[in-house]
Every structure is written in C-alpha cells, then in structure tokens.
Amino acid sequence: MVADVLLTHFNQLFCLNDPGHPLTGQEMKKATIVEDGYIAIKDGLIVALGSGEPDAELVGPQTIMRSYKGKIATPGIIDCHTHLVYGGSREHEFAKKLAGVSYLDILAQGGGILSTVRATRSASFDNLYQKSKRLLDYMLLHGVTTVEAKSGYGLDWETEKRQLDVVAALEKDHPIDLVSTFMAAHAIPEEYKGNPKAYLDVIIKDMLPVVKEENLAEFCDIFCEKNVFTADESRYLLSKAKEMGFKLRIHADEIASIGGVDVAAELSAVSAEHLMMITDDGIAKLIGAGVIGNLLPATTFSLMEDTYAPARKMIDAGMAITLSTDSNPGSCPTANMQFVMQLGCFMLRLTPIEVLNAVTINAAYSVNRQERVGSLTVGKEADIAIFDAPNIDYPFYFFATNLIHQVYKKGQLTVDRGRIL
C-alpha cells in the first residue's frame, strides 16, 4: 500500500495496544514507546507504524515525506469535559475569590453560573459561535483534536438549544471533532428557585425529547452538588434520560459527597466528573460499575483549594480515569490541556505515561470515540499531536510552555508551528 503521507524519524512515538476497554490500574502505567518511529497515513487513516526506515512499498511518487528528528508524537489530545459555549466572562468575581469567598457563596449571591446564564441568554448565535471558535482554535494550537462540549448556561429551552446549535455548527466547520452533552441541569434557574423538581420536569417533558429527536446531544449531564441538585433529583433526571437513549455523565463529589457517585454507579454512567471529595467506598462503587473518573485538576487549582481528586488512589485501586480542562468562565477559565496534563503530574502525582493514557485512549472511551481516535493504531484516524520535545517526559518537565510543533487531524496537517492552516 502506498501512503499519502509518511512521517518519519520521530525520536519517540507514544503507542499502546488498545485492549478494548478503558485502561485501569496497572494498565495505566504501560505504553509502547517506539524509538526512531514512523507513521504512514492514507485517506486520513493510520495504515502503518514502525521503527527505522519505512517499508519501500509505502513510498510512491506522490507520497509526502516529512522527517521529525528531535520530535515526539502522541495521539491527538482529547478534552472530554468542557463548558465551551457561553456569553460574557467572570473576571469581576476574581477579587471575591482571592478574598476567600467560596464558589457556592458567589452562586448564592446571584453570581457564578447564574451570572453566565444571564450573559448567555442575551448573546446572539454569532456571538456565541465566534467566542467558542476562538476557544477551539486555542485548544487546537495546544494539540487537542477532540472536545466534549456541554450546554448548561441557558437554563431555558431557547438558550440551551442555541448552545447546542453552536456546537453542531462548529462540529461541521472546525477541524476539532465535537461531542455534544445536554446539561440544562447545570443549576436551578432563578425563575425556579426553591422548586428544582418543577424545573427537572420541564427538562424531562419539554427539552430532552426534542434534543433526542433532533440529535442535538449524545450525552446528558447534571450537577449533583450541595445547594444545586440532590442525588435523588439527579437520579430522577438521568434515569429518564437513559430511558430516552442518552449516554450519561454526572458532576459528582466536587465540593461535597452527597450521593452523586452512587447515582453514577446505579445508572452505569459513562463517567463521573470532578470527584475531589470521593470516598474509598465511592471509588469501589465506580470501579464495580465500570464508570470512568473524569478528573479536573485545573478547577481545583483555579478555586485555590487544597483537595485534589485522589488520582493515585483511584489508579492503584483499579479505576479508569481521564483528565480534562473543565474549561468554563468561572471555576476554570482555561482551555489549555497541556497545563492540565502537567497538573496531573505535579498535583495528582501521576507519571507522564499515566497522564498520556488518561488524555488519549481513556478520554476516547469517555466520549464514545474509541473506535476512531485515542491511540496511534493502524485503522484509526490519523489524529496526531507532534511535540517539540526529545522524549515523552519533556512536555511535563518543561511546563507552562506550548510545545506543540504540528497537529494532524484526520491525516491533514492542521497546525504548523503556531499557525492554524
């Protein structure tokens, strides 16, 4: 087979044998590091991988050849938890945060999520589209090729649908692949204050059926947290969403452990997000149900909290984990997955191999794209992040700098030395 593109002489390729399930426990510690590696691409797919000189049959008169001495290649990075589409920003709350006002106290004062809800409701489709596109461009420049994007800053049907429509439009227009999550249960809107059940009934009866019918989202999510939605309320919504055919995610055990992990396990959610306050019993329940723990260390960093999710304990117990940005305008205003990956080492005490497995193959399972992306594997799409680094440890050791040299998306050179092509 003659390749369309042949990428050669990488210092290292980060490869693994996809076992057909999210990596857990000791599997998280393993990878195949190919020295002097090459990747052959045809029709947007990886058709060969190896070390040294490529087989002659891969090279034809039209094959594009590129050498990458001094560089490493990983699968395209996957950010599987973002709140991509929103209006406004919340830097006006930053001084309060520095003064020690808590996240929930800011929310109780009408700020936080509710502040962004007001800004998003007043924002046009074009405004939301352009703002979200800029974030996606930034992510792409940092090596991200697939992104999960939630609604949840409308809390009414008109605005929630506008957010989902923006995600759908960007999925068509932008190189990054987007996976849509419906999260109207992100907070209790002011017009339903004191009556969350009535709001959940509106979501179940009036919103979810349309989202499913128009294929606007693949996943449904809810914020199960003190002063937001209880475990029983979360179970009520997610069980109805599951009956309608949605895959499930849940924000759980972020600030307090109130039963969200139990709901995730009972309903076999694909992932439980945050988990800073998870208990040993909660970890055991998620392992037993096969729920992926999606950890968001940049949120803990941004909130200036001391308690990070117990990633080391999770892995050692046999749990599958991912890492994501939680990109949003309040609790985590960043879109930099490289920073998150570095926090995975510095604050969660994970190794570079564990982090790379978390943000590639496990993240692919978290967004149900494991058949297409998440590993440098023959037959998968050629989503490739190329780092200006001599080995896979270097991008973690040399922190706070964008080390992306190039990005390939479906076999096309999409980012080249700080420019989107």
UniProtKB/Swiss-Prot annotation:
Pfam families with a match to the protein in the record: Amidohydro_1
Key words, A-Z: Cytoplasm, Histidine metabolism, Hydrolase, Iron, Metal-binding, Zinc
Cofactor or coenzyme needed: Zn(2+); Fe(3+)
EC number assigned by the record: 3.5.2.7
Subcellular location: Cytoplasm
Family classification: Belongs to the metallo-dependent hydrolases superfamily. HutI family.
Protein name (record): Imidazolonepropionase
Species the sequence originates in: Streptococcus pyogenes serotype M49 (strain NZ131)
